[in-house]
UniProtKB/Swiss-Prot annotation:
Gene: PAE2
UniProt cross-references to SMART domains, sorted A to Z: Proteasome_A_N
Subunit details: Component of the 20S core complex of the 26S proteasome. The 26S proteasome is composed of a core protease (CP), known as the 20S proteasome, capped at one or both ends by the 19S regulatory particle (RP/PA700). The 20S proteasome core is composed of 28 subunits that are arranged in four stacked rings, resulting in a barrel-shaped structure. The two end rings are each formed by seven alpha subunits, and the two central rings are each formed by seven beta subunits. The catalytic chamber with the active sites is on the inside of the barrel.
Family to which the UniProt record says this protein belongs: Belongs to the peptidase T1A family.
Principal location: cytoplasm
Location of N-acetylmethionine modifications: M1
Annotated protein name in UniProt: Proteasome subunit alpha type-5-B
GO cellular component, one term: nucleus
Localization per Swiss-Prot or TrEMBL: Cytoplasm; Nucleus
Natural source organism: Arabidopsis thaliana
Alphabetical GO biological process terms: proteasome-mediated ubiquitin-dependent protein catabolic process
Superkingdom: Eukaryota
Function: The proteasome is a multicatalytic proteinase complex which is characterized by its ability to cleave peptides with Arg, Phe, Tyr, Leu, and Glu adjacent to the leaving group at neutral or slightly basic pH. The proteasome has an ATP-dependent proteolytic activity.
Cross-link for Glycyl lysine isopeptide (Lys-Gly) (interchain with G-Cter in ubiquitin), residue positions: K43, K66, K185
Length: 237
């Protein structure tokens, strides 16, 4: 007996006759509604810049977390459902600490990304696994390890790619084309900050301020910029 399109729509583990997983495709589309995040890799380190959508003047801007630390040498920016991102980040944090405890060394950025994507591919852990959906979030993972700086991009299918520069979220199409024009492998970390924030300024629908933009760098340690440091970057535009 053939399943209807609606039944294929609901199932996360059932391929349609065309070889598609509709729930995963819908999750990827959901990310295009999220806030824009940009990552740029340089020889010195990696810069992450993210748009923070402050939906009400009553909202405390510092409570909107769009960039999170995974380990002291890895951070990630997100676009999509923040609760889903938090689940993935918590999983990655446990993996990196277990690795450090077991082997006495930090986990590589690629291995951390792989562990995170393994969970994304299972759509959850333990009891959650049977009643789950794809994670509706995409991540830019920035890190610095024995191989130098690296930037990875993940999507809800559990796939990841290594990038020199990448944008995700609602403004990703325009931001990606701007990155292609402005990026080169010899830029400095300071130039990468300026490029990332200037492109965010182009795609955002409001004025760029320390309240609606988060910036972080991994060079080689993770550092989330203070509002004063963000203001200093904005003043260079």
């Amino acid at each position: 007996m053939f399943l209807t399109r609606t039944e294929y729509d609901r199932g996360v583990n059932t391929f349609s006759p065309e070889g598609r997983l509709f729930q995963v495709e819908y999750a990827i589309e959901a990310i295009k509604l999220g806030s824009t995040a940009i990552g740029v890799k340089t020889k010195e380190g990696v810069v992450l810049a993210v748009e923070k959508r402050i939906t009400s003047p009553l909202l405390e801007p510092s409570s909107v977390e769009k960039i999170m630390e995974i380990d002291d040498h890895i951070g990630c920016a997100m676009s999509g459902l923040i609760a889903d991102a938090r689940t993935l980040v918590e999983h990655a944090r446990v993996e990196t600490q277990n690795h450090r405890f077991s082997y006495g060394e930090p986990m590589t950025v690629e291995s951390t990304t792989q562990a995170l994507c393994d969970l994304a591919l299972r759509f959850g852990e333990g009891e959650e696994e049977s009643m789950s959906r794809p994670f509706g979030v995409s991540l830019l993972i920035a890190g610095h390890d024995e191989n130098g700086p690296s930037l990875y991009y993940t999507d809800p299918s559990g796939t990841f790619w290594q990038c020199n520069a990448k944008a995700i979220g609602s403004g990703s199409e325009g931001a990606d084309s701007s990155l292609q024009e402005q990026f080169n492998k010899d830029i400095t970390l300071q130039e990468a900050e300026t490029i990332a924030v200037s492109i965010l300024k182009q795609v955002m629908e409001e004025k760029v301020t320390p309240n609606n933009v988060d910036i972080a760098k991994v060079a080689p340690a993770y550092h989330l910029y203070t509002p004063q440091e963000v203001e200093a970057v904005i003043s260079r535009l």
